[in-house]
Curated annotation (Swiss-Prot):
GO terms for molecular function: endonuclease activity; RNA binding. Its EC number is 3.1.-.-. The keyword Nuclease applies. This is CRISPR system Cmr endoribonuclease Cmr4. It is an enzyme of class 3 (hydrolase). It comes from the Archaea. Forms oligomers in isolation. Part of the type III-B Cmr ribonucleoprotein (RNP) complex, an elongated RNP with Cmr2 and Cmr3 as the base, with Cmr4 and Cmr5 forming a helical core along the mature crRNA (39 or 45 nt in length), while the complex is capped by Cmr6 and Cmr1. The 5' end of the crRNA is bound to Cmr2 and Cmr3, while Cmr6 and a Cmr1 subunit (Cmr1-1 or Cmr1-2) cap the 3' end of the crRNA. CRISPR (clustered regularly interspaced short palindromic repeat), is an adaptive immune system that provides protection against mobile genetic elements (viruses, transposable elements and conjugative plasmids). CRISPR clusters contain sequences complementary to antecedent mobile elements and target invading nucleic acids. CRISPR clusters are transcribed and processed into CRISPR RNA (crRNA), formerly called psiRNA (prokaryotic silencing) in this organism. Changing residue 227 to A: Significant decrease in cleavage of target RNA in the whole Cmr complex. GO terms for biological process: defense response to virus. It comes from Pyrococcus furiosus (strain ATCC 43587 / DSM 3638 / JCM 8422 / Vc1).
């Protein structure tokens, strides 16, 4: 199956909104129902890519419609040539007692990443990630007295006898490039799934927003609300799968157009005018031998 691997690295706090709720946070972020992990839904990402290619890269609308499908009102006429998957979380930044912050992940997250790579035909991430219950595997640069201390969690370190951290860094380099691998190297903490879940639920950014009445200078009735943001320095990944219907000339068109997003900066989610939602994108084409290479 022809596929492209997309990396999304948040440069500013990002709000892929899920609508309003009656809870403490009025405008929460998108989350997977079964895990509670932050996610950027495929339809949201598809819209961002489509808009960027049309408005910034000035790609011909006929080409965009062929690749992404026609606008909603004409969706019945034909299907697009690609399927844009949900952007799943891979690394989440958390305050660390040593090293300022760490990139945390978990066995569940890494094994899902491995599974998704295999779906796209990439089989060069073969390391088995062990189940962790009360210990972590972490870079030496962020450990203190044989522990990694993340927010209020102090987790004992187990020896990395199988070179798991090195394998993870290598996989990140192959998937997202050397720049990303160097960024996370020395800051990785593979922690128990339950602790990871708690951190991605409790360590997002909650921001109070206020709407002021211009005439009175006071807060309008109902003008105070709370928004949730994914923090800067979070890494997501997504797969773009090409339909088997695509012919050779279609493949060339897809490669030409999608290649324009590699290394570029996109805006995802709400509050663009206050600097939110800027991400850096990487794009890797899955090769026939199961590896990846940059576009």
């Amino acid at each position: 199956m022809k596929a492209y691997l997309v990396g999304l690295y948040t440069l500013t706090p990002t709000h892929p909104g899920s609508g309003t709720e009656l809870g403490v946070v009025d405008q929460p972020i998108q989350r997977e129902r079964h895990t509670g992990f932050p996610v950027i839904w495929g339809q949201s990402l598809k819209g961002v890519l489509r808009s960027y290619l049309k408005l910034v890269e000035k790609v011909d609308e006929e080409k965009i419609n062929k690749i992404f499908g026609p606008p909603t009102e004409k969706a019945h006429e034909q299907a697009g040539l690609i399927s844009v998957g949900d952007a799943k979380i891979l690394f989440f930044p958390v305050r660390s007692l040593k090293g300022v912050y760490a990139y945390v992940t978990s066995p569940l997250v890494l094994n899902r990443f491995k599974r998704d790579l295999e779906l796209a035909g990439v089989k060069n991430f073969q390391t088995e990630i062990p189940e962790l219950t009360d210990t972590a595997i972490a870079s030496e640069e962020i450990t203190v007295d044989n522990k990694v201390i993340l927010e209020e969690f102090a987790i004992l370190i187990q020896k990395d006898d199988k070179g798991i951290l090195e394998s993870v860094v290598k996989a990140i380099e192959q998937a997202f490039g050397n720049e990303m691998a160097e960024k996370i190297k020395g800051r990785i903490a593979i922690i128990p799934d339950d602790v990871f879940r708690d951190l991605v639920e409790l360590s997002t950014e909650i921001v109070a927003r206020i709407r002021i009445n211009a005439e009175t200078g006071t807060v309008e009735t109902g003008g105070l609300w709370y928004e949730e943001y994914i923090p800067s320095d979070t890494l997501f990944y997504s797969l773009i799968l090409v339909t088997p219907r695509a012919k050779d000339n279609d493949m060339a068109l897809i490669k030409e157009v999608l290649g324009k997003i590699n290394g570029k900066y996109l805006q995802i989610g709400g509050n663009e005018t206050v600097g939110k939602g800027f991400v850096k994108v990487t794009l890797k084409e899955v090769t026939n031998n199961g590896g990846t290479h940059a576009k």
